[in-house]
């Protein structure tokens, strides 16, 4: 069987296109994985509503007057429109076991 130079060129271009698609997908997946979870290395003093997973990560759903000092992302959980006494929740993800109950 005689191979045509055009056929060889088309096969090479197709192979390059497929490799480019796989390279783009690998780059996109690497970017997603690097943004996955920001883990706080600290330990909460206490947590009553602990969400522990078998991966060793946990979050605390306690709503308190103030967030724990180790908390990096403290958000308002309950707005107190008239009294001015907002309640806060720490939205950090921690590594380890849940601390004692508050």
Swiss-Prot record:
InterPro entries on file: Bowman-Birk_prot_inh (IPR035995), Prot_inh_BBI (IPR000877), WIP1 (IPR044167)
One GO cellular component, as annotated: extracellular region
Gene name of this polypeptide: WIP1
Record-annotated disulphide pairs: 46-102, 47-60, 50-98, 67-74, 71-90
GO MF terms, alphabetically ordered: serine-type endopeptidase inhibitor activity
UniProt keywords, alphabetically: Disulfide bond, Protease inhibitor, Serine protease inhibitor, Signal
Residues the UniProt record annotates as site (Reactive bond): 52-53
Signal peptide interval: 1-15
Entry annotated with the keyword Ribonucleoprotein: no
Upregulating conditions: By wounding.
Similarity remark: Belongs to the Bowman-Birk serine protease inhibitor family.
SMART domains in the record: BowB
Protein name: Bowman-Birk type wound-induced proteinase inhibitor WIP1
UniProt keyword Kinase present: no
Domain of life: Eukaryota
Pfam families the UniProt entry points to: Bowman-Birk_leg
């Amino acid at each position: 069987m005689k191979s045509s130079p055009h056929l060889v060129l088309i096969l090479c271009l197709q192979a390059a296109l497929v490799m480019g698609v796989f390279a783009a997908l690998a780059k996109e997946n690497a970017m997603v994985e690097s943004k996955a979870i920001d883990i706080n290395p600290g330990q909460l003093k206490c947590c009553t509503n602990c969400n522990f997973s078998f991966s060793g990560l946990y979050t605390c759903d306690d709503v308190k007057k103030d967030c724990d000092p180790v908390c990096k992302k403290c958000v308002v959980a309950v707005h107190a429109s008239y009294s001015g006494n907002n309640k806060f929740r720490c939205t950090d993800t921690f590594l380890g076991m849940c601390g004692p109950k508050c």
